Amino acid sequence: MPEDSNKASNTARVVFYTSILTGGILSSFYVYSRYFRRFTCTAEVPKKIYRGRTLFGRVTSVGDGDNFHFYHTPGGRLAGWGWLRPYPETNKRGLGKETLHIRLYGVDAPERPHFGRQGQPYGDEALEWLRSYILGRNVRVKLFSPDQYGRIVGGAKVWKLTGRKDVSTEMLKNGWGVKYEGKMGAEFNGKGKLFQKLEDHARKKKIGMFQQKGKIVTPGQYKKDE
């Protein structure tokens, strides 16, 4: 009888410690997948985290006036980024395969030359403004939806001396774009009216792309004529 009692006691201990170990493994996997898994392309981002999560990382390249490439650094400095693990170089060749392509929500910048077609006035200036504002900076991106080009429509926020700034909002304030006119993939995060007011104000002040004389063709109108 004592031997049977010892066996039962040992079995109970094994079950107890196995349960603890299993629970620890499952908890670790959950924490990793939610907070420390690094996403390298749109296809890797689970649909369930759109509109509910933000991602932190470094802007590694800006190729147009309303989109950029973003190197996801989950956990930020707490996970060693910037001191134990180096940030990637900006504009590094081949890094595109390791980054998320972010399309700024709610805005449209002047088109630059492509496919042999002449670009719009102030397209290069809009690109330079965005580069100077976020290239090489850490940003936090709220994910809204993937678009038809494999990008992620998202809202980016960056810290400046005067506080955290929404990049789409600042772009419109400075006149380097218009409120997004398309119907497909339109995202405003509840700021549609504000964005229209900011565009109208920039037009009135004739700043940014609105410095040009004569009729102003918006990016949406320009793309319709392609």
UniProtKB/Swiss-Prot annotation:
Keywords: Calcium, Endonuclease, Hydrolase, Membrane, Metal-binding, Mitochondrion, Nuclease, Transmembrane, Transmembrane helix
Domain of life the protein comes from: Eukaryota
A Pfam family: SNase
Main location: mitochondrion
Chain sites annotated for binding Ca(2+): 108
Molecular functions per Gene Ontology: endonuclease activity; metal ion binding
Broad EC category: hydrolase
Catalytic site: 103, 111, 151
One term under GO cellular component: mitochondrion
Membrane topology per record: Single-pass membrane protein
Assigned protein family: Belongs to the LCL3 family.
Name of this protein: Probable endonuclease LCL3
Organism listed in the record: Yarrowia lipolytica (strain CLIB 122 / E 150) (Yeast)
Gene (name only): LCL3
